[in-house]
Amino acid sequence: MTKFSLLDHESVPKHEIISEGELKSVLSKYLIEKEQLPKIKVQDPVSKEIGAVVGDVVRITRKSQTAGEADYYRLVIE
């Protein structure tokens, strides 16, 4: 039996854990602290699938009618 991957479903946008360097760039771009980012739980099915741990920041790339694609960032919490 093959395992179903959430990330392969058309309704689930691309999720990926970003590097510390990219995180610094994002935080300086928006003039915010890491703790001010929107949150995603470590128990979220996609968080589990990508191997995210508490403290990671996840970039979610969604389709946008106006921009083509838009990036959203979430801090992984307990």
Swiss-Prot record:
It is found in: Cytoplasm. Transmembrane segments: none annotated. GO terms for cellular component: cytoplasm; DNA-directed RNA polymerase complex. Its EC number is 2.7.7.6. It catalyses: RNA(n) + a ribonucleoside 5'-triphosphate = RNA(n+1) + diphosphate. It is an enzyme of class 2 (transferase). GO terms for biological process: DNA-templated transcription. InterPro entries: Arch_Rpo5/euc_Rpb5 (IPR014381), RNA_pol_subH/Rpb5_C (IPR000783), RNA_pol_subH/Rpb5_CS (IPR020608), RPB5-like_sf (IPR035913). It holds the Pfam family RNA_pol_Rpb5_C. It comes from the Archaea. GO terms for molecular function: DNA binding; DNA-directed RNA polymerase activity. Its main location: cytoplasm. Keywords: Cytoplasm, DNA-directed RNA polymerase, Nucleotidyltransferase, Transcription, Transferase. DNA-dependent RNA polymerase (RNAP) catalyzes the transcription of DNA into RNA using the four ribonucleoside triphosphates as substrates. Belongs to the archaeal Rpo5/eukaryotic RPB5 RNA polymerase subunit family. Part of the RNA polymerase complex. This is DNA-directed RNA polymerase subunit Rpo5. It comes from Methanosarcina acetivorans (strain ATCC 35395 / DSM 2834 / JCM 12185 / C2A).
